[in-house]
Amino acid sequence: MSKVCDITGKRPRVGNKVSHANNKTKRRFYPNLQFKKFYVPETNSWIVLRVSTSVIRTINKKGILEVIKEAQRKGTISQLIVG
């Protein structure tokens, strides 16, 4: 299972874990992804997406269809079937 946001394309980043003695070892920073069910009133259906928590807040503010259209314009998602 990939750790990628369906809307924004956020992925794990690579960085360093730094100890108290300033020793550095590689680690991964994972995005906070959640499986979330969204209701689409235009099609009277539900869709399940794996999205970051920041996207959940954006969807609550703008609406699911507006966020999907914006992501398609930006090119982060190619085609998402709603319904």
Swiss-Prot record:
Gene3D superfamilies: Ribosomal protein L28/L24. GO terms for molecular function: structural constituent of ribosome. Disulfide bonds: none annotated. The keyword Ribosomal protein applies. Keywords: Ribonucleoprotein, Ribosomal protein. One of its GO terms (cellular component) is ribonucleoprotein complex. One of its GO terms (biological process) is translation. It comes from the Bacteria. NCBIfam families: L28. Belongs to the bacterial ribosomal protein bL28 family. This is Large ribosomal subunit protein bL28. It comes from Amoebophilus asiaticus (strain 5a2).
